[in-house]
Amino acid sequence: MKNKSVFIVSTEFLPGPGGIGSHAYQLAKELHKLGWQVTVFSEQGHCPDSEIEEFNRNSVFKVVRLQPTPSMALLLLKLIKLVWAAIIQRPGVIIGTGKHGAWFAVLTGKLTFTKTALIGHGTEFIVTMSKRSHKINNKVFTSANALIHVSAYTQQIAESIGVVNNNTHVIHNGGDDELFYPLPVQAVERFKQEKGLAGQKVILTAGNVQPRKGHEFVIRAMPQILKQIPNAHYYCVGPPTIKTYLEGVADEVGVKSAVHFTGRVLKDELLLWVNACDIFVLTSVATEYGDVEGFGIVIIEAALCKKPAVVTSESGPGEAIIEGITGLGIKEKDVAGITEKITTLLSNDLQRIEMGENAYRNAKANLTWSKVVKKYDAILTSLIK
């Protein structure tokens, strides 16, 4: 009988923010539905302990919260905890997601003779890491029994720095159609009234407000957007990591009254924000430290709410749209291109609505987690034969 027990070792996990944590949660939830016995090991932060405890208590699979490890002694204790759990529970496969999640997964797998599957999101292959970290990282990812990239873009980055695994796959991220779906018009209009959005053309970016998301370039495009669409407003939903800097940019270009930061919102409110927007935007960039956007789950979540997207076409998000059908692509840091694509969609209701409908149909047909997980299931099952 096959051992359908799996550990997922992640660098982050819900209920806190972060694409890797969201991906790990969805993978765990969907594998559980397919009959896998799932245990998640991860740090959990950026939200109150009470919220984390309630989340873990209500989870349908087991979540083991790991504490931050600022010292070598604590790192060793974390490894011992994982190895001991693997010895006791004997999982068939250990999945590692995020750089340190991957490192711990492979170490635990080697010490307990357990198969490993790693997931590459993009941040694991930052080219500016130290030579020592680079060497360890390459060895970890090439030695796994399977390597799954969330985009062809991520695979390209990995292979450009020497990370080549003989059992490599590309599986695009999925969206959760139980959490993201079109809401009734009345509910959306009521939310718009409550938030002061009535009469506005709403441009939305959701996720951690950090450099790689490219908020700055949308803000720099706003002066020209406002000349053509005077009622356009840009909303940045998510933890406001670089809010002060971006407010300075908005002030510099004279659009401070049209740029808004909501801070972190809970999932029910996020659903309302996505439904309330006219277009979703993710103009991500590769930062000076090599941080990149591997795919962009939020684009699929927006599509599940019938929203077209404007994204950077030369990175992972470019693989989350069908150009001209479900969204529009721009070059990295192309303020003129951002202006053109956003104004095109905001000024043409029929085109925008049609693209949103196309995005919805494509996401429902190909990119919900219930469909994506079958590809993971096939790979994991092949490892435990």
Model regions: which residues?
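Short His-centered aromatic/hydrophobic patch
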Residues: G96-A102
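Carbohydrate-associated surface elements
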Residues: Y153, G174
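Short hydrophobic beta-strand element within catalytic cores of glycosyltransferases
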Residues: I299-V311, I321
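Acidic donor-binding loop of glycosyltransferase active sites
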Residues: A258, N275-G290, K307
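Conserved acidic donor-binding segment of nucleotide-sugar-dependent glycosyltransferases
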Residues: S313, I322-G324, L328-V335, T344-L350
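Conserved donor-binding/catalytic core segment of Leloir-type glycosyltransferases
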Residues: V9, L197-K213, I219-M222
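Nucleotide-activated donor-binding/catalytic signature segment of Leloir-type glycosyltransferases, i.e.
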Residues: L246-E269
